[in-house]
């Protein structure tokens, strides 16, 4: 076996590009290696945030999303954007599980219940999605549409539900049918720590209209809760029912659509609608057609509107199918990112894939050791390059991100300087064996250590672009306008390998 000349991808976590040098630890640190690479090697900037990585417009990237997009070689839409996009494209309105549940209820003259976290928070749900579901039920002929509102106050200000409730009261008035039928704080409906006494409050409200209070409008019910000193999150079970209106308790044959997309706080209340349940004694158990917006747990036997999108032929899987060898290497802090997330949420190693883990230092905060374990990581990385064993090596250096998160500017500069020395050794090793190297980042962080708006410490990620640098013997010229999902196709192209059809990213080399 002749020694392999590896293609390496080095991900400098949290290493973004910002023109302004104020509080920019990357621009102000002494970085002779990176300076020389940018002066002499093919390089460009690529996008690592917002819709380019499947997040909402303008939202900063993060390590999980970044590595998923890099490894997938296509934009991987997060649930929020996937569902928003489906509504705009008209696909949501044709989703089989939703159509079937609504149409079955309409045919039998039964009710359609829509429930979920009623807020624009975008963490567990989005009220725009709930609005689309109400409109869809009305368009498909449902006469009885009951909206059960779980109130937020955690991902939104503590008393901010009124605007959302007013919006839906207005919508029902416009539709001429349906109503907000109940209110309860997420503290009850969305518990995730097996506090079944709380969940039972929500279950009894939904299935029996059993409530501490009844008001004739949602806004009035909320105002009364505020009078009692309850913020949105803690609003007690409240039935919304005017004089002469019938009860909105769930009945046999009704459709129930749960519009939360994040699983962790949706599981428990959903399990109360499954026959096999031991959390508490259910006074009633209506036989409803229940639809989960996404899969809340693999063992919940209910319909799913948006099943998990499995990622076929990610970079790692594709290399494995070509009989190639690959190494994933990082410190503890980012080990899951170069393995699990890079492989599209697959925990097991592919054939030909090896993993090396370097322990991150045991310090309270990384500003106390900004170089982290970069010396040991680099020794292992250089040895791997020179070993001749690997076709591809994926490596993540966590320093710029983990030290950036501390908000300590001097430490961030030291972290960048330690990184620069490490990159220098990796570049030398690659040149020595005649390999190829791409240097990039998954998102920004250390390039902005002070918030320019407030003047306060900035510890979060940024939505700025990240560098892409090539080192190797090919005459490479980069295209402009690239994004993280273009890296896998570009690497396959540099390695002379075929690109699978599932990878919709573009090759960034002209």
Curated annotation (Swiss-Prot):
Highest taxon, organism lineage: Bacteria
Amino-acid positions noted as binding Mn(2+) 2 in the UniProt annotation, renumbered to this chain: 13, 63, 442-443
Cofactor(s) the protein requires to work: Mn(2+)
Residues the record lists as binding substrate: 124, 154-155, 186, 192, 262-265, 334
Signal peptide, first to last residue: none
Gene Ontology CC: cytosol
Record's cofactor remark: Binds 2 manganese ions per subunit.
Pathway in which the depicted protein is active: Carbohydrate degradation; glycolysis; pyruvate from D-glyceraldehyde 3-phosphate: step 3/5
A GO term for molecular function: phosphoglycerate mutase activity
Entry-linked SUPFAM superfamilies: 2,3-Bisphosphoglycerate-independent phosphoglycerate mutase, substrate-binding domain (SSF64158), Alkaline phosphatase-like (SSF53649)
Active site location: 63
CDD domains: iPGM
UniProt cross-references to Gene3D superfamilies, sorted A to Z: Alkaline Phosphatase, subunit A, BPG-independent phosphoglycerate mutase, domain B
Annotated residues for binding of Mn(2+) 1: 401, 405, 461
Stored InterPro entries: Alkaline_phosphatase_core_sf, BPG-indep_PGM_N, Metalloenzyme, PGAM_B_sf, Pgm_bpd_ind
Quaternary data: Monomer.
Role of this protein: Catalyzes the interconversion of 2-phosphoglycerate and 3-phosphoglycerate.
Family: Belongs to the BPG-independent phosphoglycerate mutase family.
HAMAP family: GpmI
Name of protein: 2,3-bisphosphoglycerate-independent phosphoglycerate mutase
Naturally occurring in which organism (per UniProt): Vibrio vulnificus (strain CMCP6)
Organism placement in taxonomy: Bacteria, Pseudomonadati, Pseudomonadota, Gammaproteobacteria, Vibrionales
Gene: gpmI
């Amino acid at each position: 076996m002749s020694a392999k000349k590896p293609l390496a991808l080095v991900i400098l976590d949290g290493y973004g590009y910002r023109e302004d040098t104020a509080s920019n630890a990357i621009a102000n640190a002494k970085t002779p290696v990176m300076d020389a690479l940018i002066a002499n090697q093919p390089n460009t900037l690529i996008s690592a945030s917002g819709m380019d990585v499947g997040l909402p417009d303008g939202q900063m990237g993060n390590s999980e999303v970044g590595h998923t997009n890099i490894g997938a070689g296509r934009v991987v839409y997060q649930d929020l954007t996937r569902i928003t996009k489906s509504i705009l494209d008209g696909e949501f309105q044709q989703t089989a599980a939703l159509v079937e549940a609504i149409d079955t209820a309409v045919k039998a003259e039964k009710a359609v219940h829509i429930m979920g976290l009623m807020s624009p928070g975008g963490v567990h749900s989005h009220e725009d999605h709930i609005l689309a579901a109400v409109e869809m039920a009305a368009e498909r002929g449902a006469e009885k549409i009951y909206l059960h509102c779980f109130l937020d106050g955690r991902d939104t200000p503590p008393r901010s539900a009124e605007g959302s409730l007013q919006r839906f009261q207005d919508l029902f008035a416009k539709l001429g049918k349906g109503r907000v039928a109940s209110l309860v704080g997420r503290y009850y409906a969305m518990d995730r720590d097996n506090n079944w006494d709380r969940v039972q409050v929500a279950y009894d409200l939904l299935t029996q209209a059993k409530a501490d209070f009844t008001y004739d409008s949602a806004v009035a019910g909320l105002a009364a809760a505020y009078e009692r000193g309850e913020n949105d999150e803690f609003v007690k079970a409240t039935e919304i029912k005017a004089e002469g209106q019938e009860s909105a308790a769930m009945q046999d044959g009704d459709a129930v659509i749960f519009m939360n997309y994040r699983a962790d706080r949706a599981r428990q209340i959903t399990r109360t609608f499954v026959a096999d349940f031991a959390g508490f004694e259910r006074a009633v158990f209506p036989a409803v057609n229940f639809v989960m917006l996404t899969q809340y747990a693999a063992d919940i036997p209910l319909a799913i509107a948006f099943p998990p999108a499995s990622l076929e032929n990610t970079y790692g899987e594709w290399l494995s199918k070509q009989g190639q060898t690959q190494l994933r290497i990082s410190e503890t802090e980012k080990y899951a990112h170069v393995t699990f997330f890079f492989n599209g949420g697959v925990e097991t190693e592919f054939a030909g894939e090896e993993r090396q883990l370097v322990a991150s230092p045991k310090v309270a905060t990384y500003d106390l050791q900004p170089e982290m374990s970069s010396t040991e990581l680099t020794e292992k990385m250089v040895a791997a390059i020179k070993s001749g064993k690997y076709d591809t090596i994926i490596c993540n250096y966590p320093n710029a991100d983990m030290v950036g998160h501390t908000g300590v500017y001097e430490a961030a500069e030291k972290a960048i300087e330690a990184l620069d020395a490490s990159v220098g050794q990796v570049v030398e090793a690659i040149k020595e064996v005649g390999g190829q190297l791409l240097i990039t980042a998954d998102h920004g962080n250390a390039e902005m250590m002070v918030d320019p708006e407030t003047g306060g410490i900035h510890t979060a990620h940024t939505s700025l672009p990240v560098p892409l640098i090539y080192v190797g013997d090919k005459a490479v010229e980069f295209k402009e306008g690239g994004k993280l999902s273009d890296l896998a196709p570009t690497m396959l192209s540099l390695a002379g390998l075929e690109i699978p059809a599932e990878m919709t990213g573009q090759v960034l080399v002209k």
